[in-house]
Regions:
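RNA/tRNA-interacting regions in translation and RNA-turnover enzymes
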Residues: 1-278
Length: 279
């Protein structure tokens, strides 16, 4: 490809990715699948390898989503909520495993929901925020209080500030009921459970969020070493002990063969789960 054509392609990819970021994270109205979006991001990284999430805050791939909607207070994340890297093929996975070396890995499914930050002060839930653009999100505390499974008080009083992160979702059965109700009322249907969860969590009226049967899975403790936790597997166990809902598919894999066995187990098995996964 000629240099001029490469520049034009890079510019088109930047604009297209930014447009889809806005559709997905701000308007909750995606036009393409996550897989197609990931391919656009991968192509941009290959054509413009200097662009990444850390070095170029103006690049669309330095952002997770779009600007927060007006109507909610803004929340600046102390540690940015960045998206995960992807492996599309067995070759991609093999390359990652070789780079990682001889280490045990905690494997788990990725929930197709809305990423949130939950803050506890002395063991009491005090604030919930959306990911937003990864650096600035929206304060949706009152809506998150309505979420099924959210512990308003932890089983153990942890002094000071504790931040955990997870996904808000609507389970498949609840999504079907919600769309059936909307159809009866002549309202537009949600495209998928993720869109329904995002739209519900960002309602200005908490009673609407409460009526949507939102669920929660938590998977991360920010600054986990402060709690004496040094592995993701330990983090998940501690989250359960503190009263958080954890999805429960995690498996500690000690060899590349065990990693592949986990992937094969859930390649089809994930479709039997009561919620949607996307990785």
């Amino acid at each position: 490809m000629a240099e001029d054509d490469i520049r034009k392609r890079i510019e088109w990819l930047r604009e297209e990715i930014s447009r889809h970021d806005h559709l997905y994270h701000v308007l909750d109205a995606p036009e393409i699948s996550d897989a197609k979006y990931d391919l656009l991001v991968r192509e941009l990284k290959e054509l413009a390898p200097g662009e990444d999430r850390e070095s170029d805050s103006g690049s669309p791939i330095s952002r997770v989503g779009g600007e927060p909607l007006k109507g909610f207070m803004r929340v600046v994340h102390d540690i940015p909520m960045l998206s995960l890297e992807n492996a599309f093929t067995g070759e991609d996975l093999g390359s990652f495993l070789r780079r990682a070396g001889d280490v045990a890995m905690c494997c788990e499914l990725k929930i197709d929901g809305l990423a949130v930050s939950l803050v506890y002060q002395d063991g009491i839930f005090s604030m919930g925020a959306t990911r937003g653009d990864g650096r600035v999100g929206e304060d949706v505390t009152q809506n998150i209080r309505t979420v099924s499974g959210l512990p308003l008080e932890l089983t153990e009083k942890i002094s000071g500030r504790l931040e955990v992160r997870g996904e808000i979702l609507i389970k498949s059965e609840d999504f079907a009921v919600l769309n059936a109700e909307r159809e009866d009322q002549g309202l537009p249907l949600f495209a998928n459970p993720r869109n329904a969860a995002a739209g519900s969590l960002r309602q200005l009226d908490p009673s609407i969020a409460a009526s949507r049967k939102l669920s929660l899975f938590v998977y991360q403790v920010v600054s986990s070493q402060a709690l004496g936790l040094y592995s993701h597997y330990e983090v998940l166990g501690r989250l359960k002990a503190l009263g958080f809902p954890v999805q429960g598919t995690e498996s500690l894999c000690r060899t590349p063969v065990e990693v592949m066995e986990f992937i094969e187990k859930w390649r089809i098995g994930r479709f039997a789960l009561p919620y949607v996964t996307d990785g």
